[in-house]
Amino acid sequence: MRGLRSGALGAVLLAIAAAAPAVAQVRFSLGGGGTLPVGTFDDVAGTGWHGMAAIGFQPADFPVGFQVDGMYHRFGFEAEAIDADWQMIQGTANIVFAFNRSEERKFHLYLIGGVGGYNVKAVGDDAEGADSDTNFGVNAGAGLDFGLGNLAAFVEGRYHAIFGGTVDPETLDDATASFVPITIGIRFGGGS
């Protein structure tokens, strides 16, 4: 029964995206890829992976749109003796600036940036009883849509900075956790 409901919901969402007027297009995105920690976060976390889901609104004849997305990240601890991973769940609200969205072009460059909440927690055998920590962060990046009518493939890279999201291993003070997810995915509702 649950699978039937999920399938019906997916069909309804695709129908809405396909039937939306040319004036504005609702877009649904799914993707995933690798996540690279940078700065002091790179001292405590190894390269990870992520999955992403998003919903966006992009007017057809206006370059500025809006996207809300959620990501799940998993990083290994840099110290090999620790049997644990960093788990991160984030939700962000973003402004999207799309360059030259004419229907004749199949490739569309865009800039994306916004703010959000990031929950970080250590998980695994050596992290039992670890507390989670939720902090504010910002992100900015760029991507490329490969449009195929109401379906598009995309590749995107963003720099994220979580204020107070990690600990400086030298001073043990709170530090900004920075990372760059590289996402490859599909978009329903128009890439062109």
Identify the function of each model-found stretch.
Residues R74-A79, W86-M88, F146-S192:
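Predominantly the C-terminal beta-signal and adjacent terminal strand-loop region
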Residues L30-G34, V68-Y72, L111-G117, A142-L144, ...:
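Transmembrane beta-barrel strands of outer-membrane/channel proteins
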Residues A24-V26, A45-G51, D85-G91, F107, ...:
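Residues that define the transmembrane beta-barrel architecture of outer-membrane proteins
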Residues A54-D125, V180-I182, R187-G191:
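Gram-negative (and chloroplast) outer-membrane scaffold detector with strong preference
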Residues V26-F28, D61-F66, N150-A153, S192:
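Repeated loop/turn-to-beta-strand initiation elements of outer-membrane beta-barrel proteins
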Residues T40-T47, G76-A84, K121-A130, T134-F136, ...:
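Outer-membrane beta-barrel translocator domains and adjoining extracellular loop/strand segments
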Residues V26-D42:
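Short N-terminal segments immediately surrounding and downstream of signal-peptide cleavage
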Residues M1-V26, G191-S192:
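Cleavable N-terminal export/targeting peptides
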